Amino acid sequence: MIDREQVRKVALLARLELTPEEEEQFTTQLGSILDYVEQLNELDVSNVPPTARAIDVSNITREDNLQPYADREAILSSAPEQEGEFFKVPKILNAE
């Protein structure tokens, strides 16, 4: 079980200021979470193979195919700025 002092220490590390009511609330909530984790630790998983995902999924992406659009000008005209045939967007990298 977790106590209020441990909750205060975690709050300090996370740079959070908790009221006494919040300390009590988080003590109860974190205690419940840790109790549940303890129950999970008691499960026998020796016959369960290690997995990275719950279901086996591979390459769910689609092919990236270029498809012409009939009304290109309508799309470009909706942009706040454009440069030739392209959307112009603000520079975000090395903008210093």
Curated annotation (Swiss-Prot):
Keyword Hydrolase annotated: no
Catalytic reactions of this protein: L-glutamyl-tRNA(Gln) + L-glutamine + ATP + H2O = L-glutaminyl-tRNA(Gln) + L-glutamate + ADP + phosphate + H(+); L-aspartyl-tRNA(Asn) + L-glutamine + ATP + H2O = L-asparaginyl-tRNA(Asn) + L-glutamate + ADP + phosphate + 2 H(+)
Cross-referenced InterPro entries: Asp/Glu-ADT_sf_sub_c, GatC
GO process annotations (BP): glutaminyl-tRNAGln biosynthesis via transamidation; regulation of translational fidelity; translation
GO molecular function: asparaginyl-tRNA synthase (glutamine-hydrolyzing) activity; ATP binding; glutaminyl-tRNA synthase (glutamine-hydrolyzing) activity
Keywords: ATP-binding, Ligase, Nucleotide-binding, Protein biosynthesis
EC number per UniProt: 6.3.5.-
Subunit details: Heterotrimer of A, B and C subunits.
Function: Allows the formation of correctly charged Asn-tRNA(Asn) or Gln-tRNA(Gln) through the transamidation of misacylated Asp-tRNA(Asn) or Glu-tRNA(Gln) in organisms which lack either or both of asparaginyl-tRNA or glutaminyl-tRNA synthetases. The reaction takes place in the presence of glutamine and ATP through an activated phospho-Asp-tRNA(Asn) or phospho-Glu-tRNA(Gln).
Similarity-based family: Belongs to the GatC family.
HAMAP family xrefs: GatC
Protein name: Glutamyl-tRNA(Gln) amidotransferase subunit C
Organism from which the protein derives: Nostoc sp. (strain PCC 7120 / SAG 25.82 / UTEX 2576)
Lineage, broadest ranks: Bacteria, Bacillati, Cyanobacteriota, Cyanophyceae, Nostocales
Gene responsible for this protein: gatC
